[in-house]
Amino acid sequence: MFKKNKYQVIRGAISKELADVAYRYLQVSAEADNWMINNYVTHVGNPLVGNFHDKQVPGSYAKYSDRLMEVLLIKTIDVMQKKTGLKLVPTYSYTRLYRTGNILNRHKDRPSCEISTTLCLGGDHWPIYLDPTGADNVIEEYKGIIKPGAPTGVEVNLKPGDMLIYSGCELEHWRKPFEGKLCGQ
Protein backbone atom coordinates (compact mmCIF):
# COMPACT_ATOMS: atom_id res chain seq x y z
CA MET A 1 0.00 0.00 0.00
CA PHE A 2 2.80 2.48 0.86
CA LYS A 3 4.57 2.14 -2.49
CA LYS A 4 1.32 2.84 -4.35
CA ASN A 5 -0.15 5.63 -2.19
CA LYS A 6 3.07 7.03 -0.66
CA TYR A 7 1.46 6.86 2.77
CA GLN A 8 0.14 4.23 5.14
CA VAL A 9 -1.45 4.11 8.57
CA ILE A 10 0.02 1.59 11.00
CA ARG A 11 -2.50 0.83 13.74
CA GLY A 12 -0.90 -0.10 17.05
CA ALA A 13 2.68 0.70 16.01
CA ILE A 14 3.32 0.96 19.74
CA SER A 15 1.06 -0.15 22.58
CA LYS A 16 -1.47 2.25 24.07
CA GLU A 17 0.36 1.89 27.39
CA LEU A 18 3.70 2.94 25.89
CA ALA A 19 2.00 5.79 24.04
CA ASP A 20 0.49 6.97 27.34
CA VAL A 21 3.89 6.88 29.07
CA ALA A 22 5.42 8.90 26.22
CA TYR A 23 2.51 11.38 26.25
CA ARG A 24 2.78 11.97 30.00
CA TYR A 25 6.57 12.28 29.66
CA LEU A 26 6.04 14.90 26.94
CA GLN A 27 3.69 16.88 29.19
CA VAL A 28 6.12 16.77 32.12
CA SER A 29 9.00 17.74 29.82
CA ALA A 30 7.07 20.76 28.54
CA GLU A 31 6.27 21.91 32.07
CA ALA A 32 9.83 21.36 33.32
CA ASP A 33 11.49 23.00 30.33
CA ASN A 34 9.13 25.97 30.51
CA TRP A 35 9.90 26.39 34.22
CA MET A 36 13.66 26.19 33.62
CA ILE A 37 13.52 28.77 30.83
CA ASN A 38 11.26 31.16 32.78
CA ASN A 39 13.43 30.89 35.89
CA TYR A 40 16.71 31.36 34.02
CA VAL A 41 18.00 27.89 34.86
CA THR A 42 18.65 27.47 31.14
CA HIS A 43 18.09 29.43 27.95
CA VAL A 44 15.86 29.00 24.91
CA GLY A 45 18.76 27.96 22.65
CA ASN A 46 19.85 25.06 24.86
CA PRO A 47 19.54 21.95 22.63
CA LEU A 48 18.91 19.74 25.66
CA VAL A 49 15.56 21.34 26.41
CA GLY A 50 12.49 21.91 24.29
CA ASN A 51 10.97 25.30 23.61
CA PHE A 52 7.78 27.10 22.66
CA HIS A 53 9.32 29.00 19.74
CA ASP A 54 8.90 26.46 16.94
CA LYS A 55 8.82 28.40 13.67
CA GLN A 56 6.45 25.97 11.98
CA VAL A 57 3.90 25.79 14.82
CA PRO A 58 4.40 28.82 17.09
CA GLY A 59 3.20 28.28 20.65
CA SER A 60 3.54 24.51 20.58
CA TYR A 61 6.13 22.79 22.76
CA ALA A 62 8.73 21.25 20.47
CA LYS A 63 11.90 19.28 21.02
CA TYR A 64 14.48 17.98 18.60
CA SER A 65 16.00 14.56 19.21
CA ASP A 66 14.55 13.95 22.68
CA ARG A 67 16.03 10.77 24.13
CA LEU A 68 12.71 8.98 24.67
CA MET A 69 11.50 9.94 21.21
CA GLU A 70 14.76 8.63 19.73
CA VAL A 71 14.06 5.31 21.49
CA LEU A 72 10.56 5.25 19.98
CA LEU A 73 12.08 5.90 16.55
CA ILE A 74 14.44 2.95 16.99
CA LYS A 75 11.62 0.78 18.35
CA THR A 76 9.35 1.45 15.36
CA ILE A 77 11.91 1.26 12.54
CA ASP A 78 11.28 -2.46 11.92
CA VAL A 79 7.53 -2.05 11.49
CA MET A 80 8.08 1.00 9.25
CA GLN A 81 10.48 -0.96 7.03
CA LYS A 82 8.09 -3.91 6.88
CA LYS A 83 5.09 -1.76 5.93
CA THR A 84 6.96 0.37 3.36
CA GLY A 85 9.21 -2.29 1.88
CA LEU A 86 12.04 0.23 2.13
CA LYS A 87 15.39 0.10 3.90
CA LEU A 88 15.17 3.14 6.17
CA VAL A 89 17.89 5.05 7.96
CA PRO A 90 16.65 6.97 11.02
CA THR A 91 17.77 10.60 10.81
CA TYR A 92 16.13 12.32 13.79
CA SER A 93 13.04 12.62 15.94
CA TYR A 94 11.08 15.80 16.52
CA THR A 95 8.23 15.91 18.97
CA ARG A 96 5.51 18.46 19.61
CA LEU A 97 2.89 19.03 22.24
CA TYR A 98 0.19 20.98 20.45
CA ARG A 99 -2.11 23.41 22.23
CA THR A 100 -5.48 24.98 21.48
CA GLY A 101 -5.34 27.10 18.34
CA ASN A 102 -2.12 25.61 16.93
CA ILE A 103 -2.03 25.12 13.17
CA LEU A 104 0.34 23.06 11.06
CA ASN A 105 0.22 24.80 7.70
CA ARG A 106 0.18 22.81 4.50
CA HIS A 107 3.74 21.99 3.44
CA LYS A 108 6.20 19.43 2.12
CA ASP A 109 9.20 18.38 4.18
CA ARG A 110 12.89 19.03 3.65
CA PRO A 111 15.13 16.27 2.22
CA SER A 112 16.10 14.83 5.63
CA CYS A 113 12.40 13.97 6.06
CA GLU A 114 12.11 11.92 2.87
CA ILE A 115 10.09 9.29 4.73
CA SER A 116 8.26 10.92 7.62
CA THR A 117 6.03 9.66 10.37
CA THR A 118 3.69 11.01 12.96
CA LEU A 119 3.04 8.83 15.98
CA CYS A 120 0.00 9.67 18.10
CA LEU A 121 1.01 9.65 21.76
CA GLY A 122 -2.17 10.98 23.32
CA GLY A 123 -4.36 13.94 24.09
CA ASP A 124 -7.33 15.28 22.23
CA HIS A 125 -8.11 14.02 18.74
CA TRP A 126 -6.58 16.04 15.89
CA PRO A 127 -6.57 14.69 12.32
CA ILE A 128 -3.72 15.19 9.90
CA TYR A 129 -4.41 15.73 6.20
CA LEU A 130 -2.43 14.55 3.18
CA ASP A 131 -2.70 15.48 -0.47
CA PRO A 132 -2.01 12.16 -2.23
CA THR A 133 -1.70 13.84 -5.66
CA GLY A 134 1.83 15.05 -4.92
CA ALA A 135 0.95 18.45 -6.40
CA ASP A 136 2.59 21.68 -5.28
CA ASN A 137 -0.21 23.85 -3.89
CA VAL A 138 1.64 25.93 -1.31
CA ILE A 139 2.40 29.51 -2.27
CA GLU A 140 3.66 30.72 1.14
CA GLU A 141 3.91 28.06 3.86
CA TYR A 142 4.37 30.23 6.94
CA LYS A 143 1.49 32.49 5.94
CA GLY A 144 -0.75 29.53 5.08
CA ILE A 145 -1.30 30.69 1.50
CA ILE A 146 -2.24 27.93 -0.95
CA LYS A 147 -3.35 27.92 -4.57
CA PRO A 148 -7.07 28.32 -5.25
CA GLY A 149 -8.74 24.97 -5.87
CA ALA A 150 -6.09 22.95 -4.03
CA PRO A 151 -7.34 19.46 -3.17
CA THR A 152 -8.89 19.17 0.29
CA GLY A 153 -6.78 16.09 0.98
CA VAL A 154 -7.33 12.83 2.78
CA GLU A 155 -8.17 13.03 6.49
CA VAL A 156 -6.16 10.61 8.63
CA ASN A 157 -7.37 9.90 12.16
CA LEU A 158 -4.96 8.37 14.64
CA LYS A 159 -5.47 6.97 18.12
CA PRO A 160 -2.71 6.68 20.73
CA GLY A 161 -0.14 4.18 19.45
CA ASP A 162 -1.13 4.61 15.78
CA MET A 163 1.38 5.90 13.26
CA LEU A 164 1.12 7.55 9.87
CA ILE A 165 4.13 7.00 7.64
CA TYR A 166 4.34 9.06 4.45
CA SER A 167 6.61 10.49 1.77
CA GLY A 168 7.15 13.84 3.46
CA CYS A 169 9.00 15.43 0.54
CA GLU A 170 6.38 14.37 -1.99
CA LEU A 171 3.04 14.76 -0.20
CA GLU A 172 1.78 18.01 1.23
CA HIS A 173 0.46 17.52 4.73
CA TRP A 174 -1.15 19.78 7.31
CA ARG A 175 -3.45 20.07 10.30
CA LYS A 176 -6.38 22.44 10.68
CA PRO A 177 -6.63 24.72 13.74
CA PHE A 178 -6.55 22.58 16.88
CA GLU A 179 -9.76 22.85 18.89
CA GLY A 180 -8.76 20.51 21.70
CA LYS A 181 -6.61 21.26 24.74
CA LEU A 182 -3.45 19.17 24.17
CA CYS A 183 -2.23 16.66 21.57
CA GLY A 184 1.12 14.89 21.67
CA GLN A 185 2.80 13.59 18.52
Where are these regions (language model features)?
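Short, active-site-adjacent segments that bind or coordinate small-molecule cofactors and metal centers
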Residues: 54-58, 174, 184-185
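Short helix-capping and hinge/turn segments at secondary-structure transitions, especially at repeat
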Residues: 81, 85-86, 122-126
